[in-house]
Each structure stands twice: as C-alpha cells, then as structure tokens.
Swiss-Prot record:
The lineage of its organism: Bacteria, Pseudomonadati, Pseudomonadota, Alphaproteobacteria, Hyphomicrobiales. This is Nucleoside triphosphate pyrophosphatase. Gene3D superfamilies: 3.90.950.10. GO terms for biological process: nucleotide metabolic process. It comes from the Bacteria. Its main location: cytoplasm. Its EC number is 3.6.1.9. GO terms for cellular component: cytoplasm. HAMAP family: Maf. Its cofactor is a divalent metal cation. Belongs to the Maf family.
C-alpha cells in the first residue's frame, strides 16, 4: 500500500536539500523542478516589507512559475525569510557577508518566516506561513571563523549562514517553533491540505 494517492508525484519548485528530505521522509513522492525566478527583484518590486508577506509572495511565485510549464500538476513552492526585529536578511553572498550576519545575529533572537503555496494551472489552492523564533548564543570572533572554516560554502546557501539540521545547531541557545518550519517547509499544514484533497491514505 502506498501513502500517496495522487495520480502523479507532487512537483517541488525548489532545489533545497532540506525541503526534499522533509517530503521524502513524509512519504510524499515528488519531482524537484527549481523555479528560475529573480527572488530579490520580485521582493523589491512588490513593495512588501513584512518578512512573512515576502516569504508568502515568493513561495507563490515559485510555484506559479513552475506550474506554467507543468499543466495539470500540483506544484509546491516554498520560501523562508529571516527577520531581526524589523530588518530582513538575504542569503550571504560570500564568507565575509556570512561572518557579518553571524555577528549581527549572535546573542539575539531572530525569526524565521517559512511559507508554502500549492498551485495547479496557475491557480493558488493553498498557502500558509509559519514562524519559528531562534535564539543564537553569543559568539566570539574566533568561534565565528572556526564555524565558517568547518561549514565552508554551505554558509552561503541559507539565510542566516546556518543550517539548523547540520552544524548550525552549535550556534544556538534556544529554538522555539516547529522543526519543519525551521527547515523551511511547514509540513503539518501542508499535509492537512493534501488530506483535504484526498491525496493521502493517512
């Protein structure tokens, strides 16, 4: 017996390894087809400033973009933004930018806003945004440099310069929120939607 009842696998409009792992572990078959969109350009042109609103827009835009090329398929888009107070962060461009982000986040609490959207034939069928609050411990300059030495280029693949599912866990004193939200894919609301569409056996 299979858990997934859909006629075709879900399409995941993302190349995120963490999101792919979350879906795979939940028994959801998918085809990973990243969306080739200008995320920063779309966010800036939107005029939106709230991190959750930006994440929601980008998740929807990613899913809609891929949906245009795969008619009839259920396409899942996801995005995550990081906010320190009223200030939003982007993925660091290089090691120096990653170190700067870590200096700013160290010893403070920030928020991760994770959004999902499900689109079919250009129509958004489901959208959700979840928030996790992360408390990074105080870090010395030597600790920041040692961390960046160990993680290498991975520091530039995630906003905040860390992956909590990996070595990034060493940076934190406290984590408040859903584990899947932290990984960038609010899974429980998504599963609820899929069940409502009779796509899951459980």
């Amino acid at each position: 017996m299979t858990l997934w009842l859909g006629p075709q696998p879900l399409v995941l409009a993302s190349q995120s390894r963490a999101r792919q792992t979350v879906l795979a572990n939940a028994g959801i078959p998918f085809d990973a087809i990243p969306a080739d969109i200008d995320e920063r350009g779309i966010a800036e042109a939107s005029g939106l400033s709230a991190p959750g609103d930006i994440a929601a827009l980008l998740a929807q835009q990613k899913a809609a973009f891929v949906s245009n090329y795969h008619p009839g398929r259920l396409v899942l888009g996801a995005d995550q933004t990081l906010a320190l107070g009223a200030r939003g962060f982007n993925k660091p461009a290089d090691r120096a930018a990653a170190a700067k982000q870590l200096r700013e986040l160290a010893g403070r609490r920030h928020e991760l806003h994770s959004a999902v959207a499900v689109v079919r034939n250009g129509i958004t069928l489901f959208a959700d945004v979840a928030i996790a609050r992360m408390t990074m411990r105080p870090l010395t300059e030597a600790e920041i440099e040692a961390y960046l030495d160990v993680v290498g280029d991975k520091a530039t693949t995630s906003v905040g310069a860390y992956q909590i599912e990996g070595l990034g866990v060493h940076l934190f004193d406290g984590i408040h929120g859903d584990h899947f939200t932290i990984l960038g894919l609010p899974l429980l609301p998504l599963l609820g939607f899929l069940r409502s569409q009779n796509l899951l056996a459980v």
